[in-house]
Amino acid sequence: MVVDGKTTRLRASCNACNESKVRCSQRKPTCARCERNGVECIYGLSRRTHKDAPPISMPPSQRSHNHPRGASRSSSSGGDTKANSNSSSNWHMSPNVPFMIPPQQQQQQQKDEAAAAAAATPRFQCMYTPQDATADTVNRAGLLLDMDFSSLVTGSSSPLTSVDPLSAAVTRFPTPGAEHTNPWALGPFFGGNTNNNSINNPDWTRQPTTMGPMITVPTTAPPSPSPSCTECSCHAGVTELLSSMRGGGDDRRLSLDAQLAKLKRCIVSSETSMGCAHGRDDAEPIHILAVSTLIGYVIDEFEMLASESPLRLSSSLADMSGSRNAERVAESILSSGSDESMSMSSMAATTGVNNMSMSMSMGNLLEPRLSWGVLELEDDDEVDLRQRLYLLSFRKLERLLSQLTIYLRNLHDARAGLPEPSRHMAFVMACDYTRLWLEKKAEDVKRMFLVARPAGDETMDPALMFTAH
């Protein structure tokens, strides 16, 4: 539009739609919204083209102070003011200056702005109470900088905490803090503490409207596990032993007494884990898989003992017989011969005895001797007693496998009574097949112990004999 030879550009949207932050139909001279609401439609000057154009919410008393003092600027602004003198006699001011609008039009404007704010936020419904038209102008303008979000939830209409529709529409989505941007800090969704969520974050408590999908915000934390579940330590022994057996190679260099003590500890820890009663009745006892793995390690250790026990015993007997022969040779040399030959022979015999004693001490470090108080056991008796000791320890493993069988049978019966039992039978069948494999492997290892027993021992204890399952 050209006024007095100068091009004047107006805003794309009218002042009323621009104030309410809604889309304007841009129809001249009256847009659809202003025509529907029965208000005056005014298109102000464009701020991009006319830098000296006053803002929409600026009172007329402040416009004269913002005009530049110059001949060129004054002539241009004078032409612009003259061009809009007929249509801008009554500017549509923002809610921050209520005395510029008649009371009837101001009430209609507040209703329009509240409806526009609700239309701009279809998913959330802010509890807003329109404020009094006679409120203090300073307090109303200060709300834009210091707004209390609690009024959005409680719906209070006090002059100090009320919010105008424009501020409610612009600030309806708060900036999330670190507790909301971190996916692992979502307490209500991961069972965390939600006592402070409703106080520190009131914006999350707004009620959803029926226009969008329903969003259910949990108001209480999920039920926490009972203290007995959090304090359960029945499976700690199995976990610790499985972690220590990953190396495998270092355990083979242990002495026999240390190996048997560790195997006994594995058996006791497995029995404790199977006897745990802290789990839920409808949950799958995953710890049984860890117990089965530990039993497999125990069977491997017994297999190693069965394959290496004759070799160890024979080497131990050879060391003991060699040391005794060296002692006899030293005694015979010392009892006969001259002084020079005696000294030479004694040095050689002493060296041989020291070497045998060193090898004997190393053998004793790996293979401790069996004794019963002051009773000295013969070599053959010690071999026989060690073999029986292996079988006695292995009998504890067989008792553990029997307990595993009873446990899985009870688990099968319990899962059969639940709704949709086929959903749990796969886990029970997997555990049962693992048990069958462990029993078969244990039978083969026990057969190795019986084959490696000392020759000529026909009076074996019937309780230690192999019985097929």
UniProtKB/Swiss-Prot annotation:
GO terms for cellular component: nucleus. It comes from the Eukaryota. SUPFAM superfamilies: Zn2/Cys6 DNA-binding domain. CDD domains: GAL4. Residues 82-93 have a biased composition (Polar residues). The keyword Transferase does not apply. Residues 49-118 are annotated as: Disordered. It is found in: Nucleus. Keywords: DNA-binding, Metal-binding, Nucleus, Transcription, Transcription regulation, Virulence, Zinc. The keyword Transcription applies. Residues 14-41 bind DNA. GO terms for molecular function: DNA binding; DNA-binding transcription factor activity, RNA polymerase II-specific; zinc ion binding. Residues 104-118 have a biased composition (Low complexity). It holds the Pfam family Zn_clus. Transcription factor; part of the gene cluster that mediates the biosynthesis of the phomopsins, a group of hexapeptide mycotoxins which infects lupins and causes lupinosis disease in livestock. May play a role in the regulation of the production of phomopsins. This is Transcription factor phomD'. It comes from Diaporthe leptostromiformis.
